Swiss-Prot record:
Domain Toprim: 418-533
Protein name: DNA gyrase subunit B
Record site: Interaction with DNA: 449, 452
Gene expressing this chain: gyrB
Cofactor (UniProt): Mg(2+); Mn(2+); Ca(2+)
Biological role stated in the UniProt entry: A type II topoisomerase that negatively supercoils closed circular double-stranded (ds) DNA in an ATP-dependent manner to modulate DNA topology and maintain chromosomes in an underwound state. Negative supercoiling favors strand separation, and DNA replication, transcription, recombination and repair, all of which involve strand separation. Also able to catalyze the interconversion of other topological isomers of dsDNA rings, including catenanes and knotted rings. Type II topoisomerases break and join 2 DNA strands simultaneously in an ATP-dependent manner.
Residues given in the record as Mg(2+) 2 binding sites: 498, 500
Uppermost EC category: isomerase
């Protein structure tokens, strides 16, 4: 067979075909969701460019219920006149021709994020359908595209007094085969960033799938961004370092503040586009800052006694910083703009950071002292850790020659097929060791209380026995000098902890450890969370395992509503009402769950009474509100057999000109208030509750009997009927709630949690590093106030607390 390679093998991809053939070159990964969301950002970036030129004040991004996304701005509107070279409208040129746009002409945009002129045409190429509406020159224009091709020329569909551009697109299922669902959190993160970077713009994000709406309009700019990022940390100095300056046509804006953590968080932007891989602006910032602070430390004599060498990582420990540059002709490493390669940016930033940082340090001596002290302490800790590593080199805790004694290793040598289970305690570790597949499953038991790596310094952390065992077992090392991912011994690192409070605590600590110290393991998808069952059900010889409370709820409903017969009082079967009865009972059960998770929390007795209480529609009439809340309190006082007493209050909301009732529950000298805010009284939850009561009264006001498992019950209230059904469904059923993995024997643990054929595992990913960072700080950091607030907001929703 001849292998001919000649001119016939050379393919020319014209128009937008190149984009469809190699979409990853233009928007990034099309499988993991990043490329999908990048489509939205390409359109938003065009609107931001209008804002940078002073023509746009408002951007509205909408996720529609059919999973399309629209972006609307009030800029000048895309040009609609006929292009002199292409003989079609300029709008059509922009949407169908690669490397076209107004950003190559310096008169239209002095500064822009667009470099290659491919953004919006790429979105068009990778969309099943795209709708374009332009408001310009008192006219409203429209054009529809399918798979990048126009259905018809740009046409006038009406008149308007506004200007702007509206683009709505439906992503192509052929391109985005694995992930076609937009995530609100990812879009929210980017739009929030843009609002901080452009304090003169209001950006709205609406999700029609869930009715969530947000407006991002941060007038404090990047200083407000720093406050947002440091909200759950403890800053070590008061005044945020900030400056804005221009040199050689490059505008630089920097804000930064140190906190008491040990990690750096530096975000880089060029013309509002984020660079996750940094680039020349980050390099200039780092070198300029290290040099400037070293000079200041030397001049002021801060380091006379110890003569510790200060390096870049010492300077950046606990630093939160925003670097935002505006540059006329930015150069990036790729269309996704993840790395800036404009060489001129480095020298400009080095120079400007030197001038402004020295000025800040001299003008703020108190802040300067705290910053320098932190830097010197960081250097001392680093040096101490280095010396400890050198002294213990031969028997280093990181040396793979001596694996931890508690590790039961596997036989497999290829990390791609090797699993390590990080198990809580020796008891569970014993069951896991006996139940595992020795060929490729290793077990490492960890003590109940491992070190809080969020609060601990690096040298203290690596000397902790539990962390040391973990690092040794993984084999990849830790820290800049020791870490090597190629030496990782397992590509499946599975956290397997109990379902109780201690288990959740240890799981959080381990996730903190991986997130802070070995983030690449999470980024590469090597970290998993095992999903052992929470319940075991047994009836006769049959056994069933249930994974979580949600699955248990579904099982309970199904079991409670199975094999029912409805009868009238004279024993006639009336099963025509059975379907409605099951619907009411299911809704009651689910409303209880919804209310527990909702921010509108009320005690069970109040919740159950609301079902039968009439719907409160009118909050403007105080007499109606008074009658409603008075009757509710009166009924509660009659039905509550405890020492609780229910009284009422009515608060006037002057802003809205309405009256909002409050129920006050007193018990001896203590009382708790529950407000019925307008937000709740207009919510879906409240409507569901009152509709449920009305349906029950309508269908079951007559005397109806229910029969199940040979027993009969006279229907009186939803609550009592549901309790009876649950009780009947549990007859002969043994329910065991596992508090610990040690309660399972090896065979059960294998069948439910470790067998690749039957197990469920959660892969740990960090979609939004900033939000994850804040969550870890809230739960694990030293600042008490944010944690207290978190506990107060969530305590009432807590279930299954072990006392």
């Amino acid at each position: 067979m001849k292998n001919i390679y000649d001119s016939s093998n050379i393919k020319i991809l014209r128009g937008l075909d190149a984009v469809r053939k190699r979409p990853g070159m233009y928007i990034g990964d099309t499988d993991d969701g990043s490329g999908l969301h990048h489509m939205v950002f390409e359109i938003v970036d065009n609107s931001i460019d209008e804002a940078l030129s002073g023509y746009c004040k408002e951007i509205i991004v909408t996720i529609h219920s059919d999973n399309s996304v629209s972006v609307k701005d009030d800029g000048r509107g895309i040009p609609t006149d006929i292009h002199p070279e292409e003989n079609i409208s300029a709008a059509e040129v922009i949407l169908t021709v690669l490397h076209s746009g107004g950003k190559f002409d310096n008169a239209s945009y002095q500064i822009s994020g667009g470099l290659h002129g491919v953004g919006i045409s790429v979105v068009n190429a990778l969309s099943e359908k795209l709708e374009l509406i332009i408001d310009k020159n008192k006219k409203k224009y429209q054009q529809i595209y399918r798979h990048g091709k126009p259905e018809n020329p740009l046409s006038i569909i009406g008149t308007t007094d506004t200007t702007g551009t509206y683009i709505r697109f439906w992503p192509s299922y052929k391109t985005f085969t694995n992930n076609i669902k937009f995530q609100y959190e990812i879009l929210s993160k980017r739009l929030r960033e843009l609002s901080f970077l452009n304090s003169n713009i209001a950006i709205y994000l609406e999700d029609n799938r869930t009715s969530i709406k947000n407006c991002y309009h941060y007038k404090g700019g990047i200083k407000a961004f720093i406050k947002f990022l440091n909200a759950k940390k403890t800053p070590i100095h008061t005044h945020i370092f900030y400056f804005r300056s221009t040199k050689d046509q490059i505008e630089l804006e920097i804000a930064m503040q140190w906190n008491n953590s040990h990690q750096e968080n530096i975000l880089c932007f060029t013309n509002n586009i984020p660079q996750k891989d940094g680039g020349t602006h980050l390099a200039g910032f780092r070198s300029g800052m290290t040099r400037t602070l070293n000079l200041h430390i030397e001049r002021e004599g801060y380091n006379k006694k110890n003569k510790t060498t200060i390096i870049g990582e010492d300077v950046r420990e606990g630093l939160t910083a925003i670097i935002s540059i505006k540059i006329p002709d930015p150069k990036f490493s790729s269309q996704t703009k993840d790395k800036l390669v404009s060489s001129e940016a480095r020298s400009v930033i080095e120079s400007l950071i030197n001038e402004n940082l020295i000025e800040y340090l001299l003008e703020n001596p108190s802040d300067s002292k705290f910053i320098i002290q932190k830097i010197i302490n960081a250097a001392k800790v680093r040096e101490a850790a280095r010396r400890a590593r050198e002294i213990n080199k031969k028997k280093s805790i990181l040396d793979l020659g001596a694996l931890p004694g508690k590790l039961s290793d596997c036989q497999e040598n290829d990390p791609k097929f090797s699993e390590i289970y990080l198990v809580e305690g020796d008891s569970a570790g014993g069951s896991a060791k006996q139940g595992r597949n020795r060929k490729n499953q290793a077990i490492l038991p960890l003590k109940g209380k491992i070190l809080n790596v969020e609060k601990s310094k690096f040298d203290k952390m690596i000397l902790s026995q539990e962390v040391a065992s973990l690092i040794t077992a993984l084999g990849c090392g830790i820290g800049k000098n020791e870490y090597n991912i190629d030496k990782l011994r397992y590509h499946y690192i599975i956290i397997m902890t109990d379902a109780d409070v201690d288990g959740a605590h240890i799981r959080t600590l381990l996730l903190t450890f991986f997130y802070r110290q070995l983030p690449e393991l999470i980024e590469k998808g090597y970290v998993y969370i095992a999903q052992p069952p929470l319940y075991k059900l047994k009836k006769g010889r049959k056994e069933k395992y249930i994974k979580n409370d949600e699955e248990m709820n579904t099982y309970q409903i199904k079991n409670a509503l199975k094999d029912l017969v409805l009868k009238s009082e004279d024993n006639l079967i009336i099963n025509q009402k059975l379907k409605k009865f099951k619907k009411i009972m299911s809704e009651y059960h689910y409303i209880q769950i919804i209310m527990k998770q909702s921010k509108h929390y009320f005690p069970k007795l109040v919740f159950n009474e609301l079902i039968y209480h009439n719907h409160l529609h009118n909050l403007k009439d105080i007499e109606i509100v008074k009658e409603w809340i008075y009757t509710l309190a009166e009924n509660l006082n009659k039905k509550d057999n405890s020492n609780n007493h229910y009284s009422i209050e009515i608060k006037e909301n002057l802003d809205k000109n309405i009256f909002e009732p409050t129920i006050k529950i007193s018990r001896y000298a203590h009382y708790t208030k529950y407000d019925f805010k307008e937000e709740f009284l207009k919510s879906k939850e409240y409507l569901l509750i009152t509709n449920l009561g009305e349906s029950f009264k309508k269908y079951f006001s007559d005397k109806v009997l229910i029969e199940k498992s040979g027993s009969t019950y006279k229907i009186d209230s939803i609550k009592n009927t549901w309790k009876w059904l649950i009780k009947q469904s549990k007859r002969g059923l043994f329910i065991q709630r596992y508090k610990g993995l040690g309660e399972m024997n090896p065979e059960q643990l294998w069948n439910t949690t470790m067998n690749p054929e039957t197990r469920n595992m959660l892969q740990v990913t960090i979609k939004d590093a900033v939000s994850a960072n804040n969550l870890f700080n809230t739960l694990m950091g030293e600042a008490v106030e944010p944690r207290r607030q978190f506990i107060e907001n969530n305590a009432l929703k807590a279930e299954n607390i072990d006392v």
